[in-house]
From Swiss-Prot:
Gene Ontology, cellular component aspect: cytoplasm; microtubule
Gene Ontology molecular-function annotations: GTP binding; hydrolase activity; metal ion binding; structural constituent of cytoskeleton
SUPFAM superfamilies, A to Z: Tubulin C-terminal domain-like (SSF55307), Tubulin nucleotide-binding domain-like (SSF52490)
Annotated function: Tubulin is the major constituent of microtubules, a cylinder consisting of laterally associated linear protofilaments composed of alpha- and beta-tubulin heterodimers. Microtubules grow by the addition of GTP-tubulin dimers to the microtubule end, where a stabilizing cap forms. Below the cap, tubulin dimers are in GDP-bound state, owing to GTPase activity of alpha-tubulin.
Reactions mediated catalytically: GTP + H2O = GDP + phosphate + H(+)
Residues that bind GTP: 11, 71, 140, 144-145, 179, 206, 228
Domain of life: Eukaryota
Name this protein carries in UniProt: Tubulin alpha-2 chain
Annotated active site: 254
Cofactor(s) needed for function: Mg(2+)
Metal-binding among keywords: yes
Complexes and interactors: Dimer of alpha and beta chains. A typical microtubule is a hollow water-filled tube with an outer diameter of 25 nm and an inner diameter of 15 nM. Alpha-beta heterodimers associate head-to-tail to form protofilaments running lengthwise along the microtubule wall with the beta-tubulin subunit facing the microtubule plus end conferring a structural polarity. Microtubules usually have 13 protofilaments but different protofilament numbers can be found in some organisms and specialized cells.
């Protein structure tokens, strides 16, 4: 088996977890108490959904997941919510005082008291796996627990499970709206710490999703539940190939191989289509060509940036539902002729394609329409450097005046960690810039002609 352990850290991570597991349960026909009426092979653990669920002797399915937050309120909602019987009580770990939006509290002061408890729980989950493939880590960059504790945990996971891949689904601070003033600080500190510990990080920004909910789903005032359900669909598409049999299956390590050209450049952009409300879907049936084309619209992306200004290094298209390879080939050919998609010149313009015959499922009564086919595009583009540049600019404005720095120093950090993190991000921006520069310019011409 190629099992996958999900780790949900902090409020954002836990709430994304709620949406994801709600959707997985619907997709696999698992009831909120973990029973699965359709499962004929009770106790036999070779079904493909067992990558995400363990099966007990009595036929109960338990998620391979750990929920961690340094304050109790959000996890208490899981403990008393509709899925309270689904999770093992020891998988829900909450502390007494929160990280107060402070990376240093999450990473040093409070985080260090909980990290061993969490690792112990993860170890128990890992022991139940026959061939653990890796970890999916859900968190936000802006919060104290999501930034501080998650980075501490990832450092420790690298030590204990060195070879296992770690993929992140991370909420990136939105350009305009922020939940806290110090989000930029937390984000650069955590990015700096986890850059070498994460293999691939799918960033999502709340504002981009907020706009999608307003524009495509006609939700006038989207709540976090609306946002998380949309994120759930994306995560479900990314993990569908691990949970279902399919024609072209893609596993975790395959994502990295195809999306990450250099270890540091591991922040793919995610786009999902079709995102339409039930009223609209009633009148239109979207073809493979239309949903593929929609993926290249900046408006459908999960991070605010413009790929038309950047170059693509790699591109994965994950289809699910009623899709045949012939249509996909035609759609991609069409996109290549119509759109101005520019690939870096050192990379072949190939698209990695995955097809899963399981149609997309939606949560009943939610905003998204039930459709027969959907696609999730993961692309590594140099345009995402715009997002880093925006963040760095905000940090510079605050750090020039040393605003809010005393909160971090008071929790045991040193001021030089800020400048180190800022330098590392400057290097990251430069890395993206260099990757996009054409290699065959200037003096390389003679060598380029040899081939």
């Amino acid at each position: 088996m190629r099992e996958c352990i999900s780790i949900h850290v902090g409020q954002a991570g836990v709430q994304m977890g709620n949406s994801c597991w709600e959707l997985y349960c619907l997709e696999h026909g698992i009831q909120p108490d973990g029973q699965m009426p359709s499962d004929k092979t009770v106790g036999v653990c070779n079904d493909s959904f067992n990558t995400f669920f363990t099966e007990t002797g009595s036929g109960k399915h338990v998620p391979r997941a750990v929920f961690v937050d340094l304050e109790p309120s959000v996890i208490d909602e899981v403990r008393s919510g509709i899925y309270r019987q689904l999770f093992h009580p020891e998988q829900l770990i909450s502390g007494k005082e929160d990280a107060a939006n402070n990376y240093a509290r999450g990473h040093y002061t409070i985080g260090k008291e909980y990290v061993d408890i969490v690792l112990d729980r993860i170890r128990k989950l890992a022991d139940q796996c026959t061939g653990l493939q890796g970890f999916l880590i859900f968190r936000s960059f802006g919060g104290g627990t999501g930034s501080g504790f998650a980075s501490l945990l990832m450092e420790r996971l690298s030590v204990e499970y060195g070879k296992k891949s770690k993929l992140e689904i991370a909420i990136y601070p939105a350009p305009q709206s922020a939940t806290s003033v110090v989000e930029p600080y937390n984000s650069i500190l955590t990015t700096h710490t986890t850059l070498e510990h994460s293999d691939c990080c799918f960033m999502v920004d709340n504002e981009a999703i907020f706009d999608i909910c307003q524009r495509n789903l006609d939700v006038s005032r989207p709540t976090y539940t609306n946002l998380n359900r949309l994120i759930g669909q994306i995560v479900s598409s990314i993990t569908a190939s691990l949970r279902f049999e399919g024609a072209l299956n893609v596993d975790l390590t395959e994502f990295q191989t195809n999306l990450v050209p250099y270890p540091r450049i591991h922040f793919p952009l995610t786009t999902y289509s079709p995102i339409i409300s039930a009223e609209k879907a009633y009148h239109e049936q979207l073809s493979v060509g239309e949903i593929t084309s929609a993926c290249f619209e900046p408006a459908n992306q999960m991070v605010k940036c413009d790929p038309r200004h950047g170059k693509y290094m790699a591109c994965c298209l994950l289809y699910r539902g009623d899709v045949v390879p012939k249509d996909v080939t035609a759609s991609i050919a069409n996109v290549k002729t119509k759109r101005t998609i520019q690939f870096v010149d050192w990379c072949p313009t190939g698209f990695k394609v995955g097809i899963n015959y399981q149609p997309p499922t939606v949560v009943p009564g939610a905003d998204l329409a039930k459709v027969s086919r959907a696609v999730c595009m993961l692309s590594n583009t140099t345009a995402i450097a715009e997002a880093w540049a925006r963040l760095d600019h905000k940090v510079d404005l605050m750090y020039a005046k040393r605003a809010f720095v005393h909160w971090y120093v008071g929790e045991g950090m040193e001021e030089r960690q800020f400048s180190e993190a800022r330098e590392d991000l400057a290097t990251l921006e430069k890395d993206y810039e260099e990757v996009g520069i054409d290699t065959a310019d200037g003096e390389d011409d003679e060598e380029a002609n040899d081939y």
